[in-house]
């Protein structure tokens, strides 16, 4: 038994979609979450800067005595995950491979779409992972740089959000049967995305898929938390305004949480 927390990092609030699923599946595990909303979005930034910011988040989590780090950010996974994983002596998990694997299982026509930040799409990481496992699957990738700012400003239900999502996704409509939400912010726009793509297109939440892998690693390294612990205290940190973060988090997690400000 290991009662240390699991650390989550993201460029902002998007990684809460992963946390929500973890709380549902593994309610006995403690969580420490750091969201770098002050510098979001990461997607348009240079690779060197993204790597630098990611390491700052990693080092912060290490000060919290975490037993595992989850990259709840596709951009950080694409740019820095392999380097961080090789450097640390605790498990480090990314969201890309679980999402790619789920897309392969889901597609019936071999036509998969991937939406993500400019950096995630430019890295071509999803297409590489998908076609490594299933060479016959066709992958169409599309950068959606306007989605993260919508979520970070809590405008997910606005008419502006609906127009931006419709305009952004139009190149994929009618051409795919499975769509990977290749940014953990995007599930917060899921109803609008589903409406635009149509009911026949299966949406893959890469973050939620990653929770299954978290469970596997906890078992493999024998670092599960206390299954009998009912009152688990989580900690949430943001580099931006805690009140805005708290408002979005409370809606998504369906519980009121305390958010602390941190300067990196």
From Swiss-Prot:
Binding site for substrate: 10-11, 42-43, 74-75, 184-185
This protein's UniProt keywords: Cell shape, Cell wall biogenesis/degradation, Isomerase, Peptidoglycan synthesis
Enzyme Commission designation: 5.1.1.3
GO process terms (BP): cell wall organization; peptidoglycan biosynthetic process; regulation of cell shape
Catalytic activity field: L-glutamate = D-glutamate
Enzyme category, top tier: isomerase
Single Gene Ontology MF annotation: glutamate racemase activity
InterPro entries linked to this entry: Asp/Glu/hydantoin_racemase (IPR015942), Asp/Glu_race (IPR001920), Asp/Glu_racemase_AS_2 (IPR033134), Glu_race (IPR004391)
Active site: 73 (proton donor/acceptor), 183 (proton donor/acceptor)
Entry superkingdom: Bacteria
Known pathway: Cell wall biogenesis; peptidoglycan biosynthesis
Pfam families referenced in this protein's UniProt entry, alphabetically: Asp_Glu_race
SUPFAM superfamilies associated with the record: Aspartate/glutamate racemase
Similarity comment: family membership: Belongs to the aspartate/glutamate racemases family.
Purpose: Provides the (R)-glutamate required for cell wall biosynthesis.
Matches recorded under PANTHER family: GLUTAMATE RACEMASE
Protein name, UniProt field: Glutamate racemase
Organism: Streptococcus pyogenes serotype M28 (strain MGAS6180)
Upper taxonomic lineage: Bacteria, Bacillati, Bacillota, Bacilli, Lactobacillales
Gene: murI
């Amino acid at each position: 038994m290991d009662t240390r927390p699991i650390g989550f990092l993201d460029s902002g609030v998007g990684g809460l979609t992963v946390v929500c699923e973890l709380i549902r599946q593994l309610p006995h595990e403690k969580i420490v979450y750091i969201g770098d909303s002050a510098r979001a979005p990461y997607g348009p930034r240079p690779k060197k800067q993204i790597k630098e910011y990611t390491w700052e988040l990693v080092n912060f989590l290490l000060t919290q005595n975490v037993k595992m780090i989850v990259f709840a950010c596709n951009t950080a996974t694409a740019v820095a995950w392999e380097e961080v994983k090789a450097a640390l002596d605790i498990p480090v998990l990314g969201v890309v491979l679980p999402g790619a694997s789920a897309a392969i299982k889901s597609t019936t026509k071999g036509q998969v779409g991937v939406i993500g930040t400019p950096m995630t799409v430019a890295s071509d990481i999803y297409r590489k992972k998908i076609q490594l496992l299933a060479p016959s699957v066709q992958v169409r990738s599309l950068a959606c740089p306007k989605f993260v700012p919508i979520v970070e400003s809590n405008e997910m239900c606005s008419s502006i959000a609906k127009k931006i999502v419709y305009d952004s996704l139009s190149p994929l409509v009618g051409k795919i049967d499975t769509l990977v939400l290749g940014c953990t912010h995007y599930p917060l726009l899921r109803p609008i995305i589903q409406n635009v793509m149509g009911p026949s297109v299966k949406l893959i939440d890469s973050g939620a898929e990653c929770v299954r892998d978290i469970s596997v690693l906890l078992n493999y390294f024998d670092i599960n938390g206390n299954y009998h612990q009912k009152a688990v205290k989580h900690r949430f940190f943001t580099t931006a305004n805690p009140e805005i973060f708290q408002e979005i988090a409370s809606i998504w997690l369906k519980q009121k949480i305390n958010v602390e400000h941190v300067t990196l």
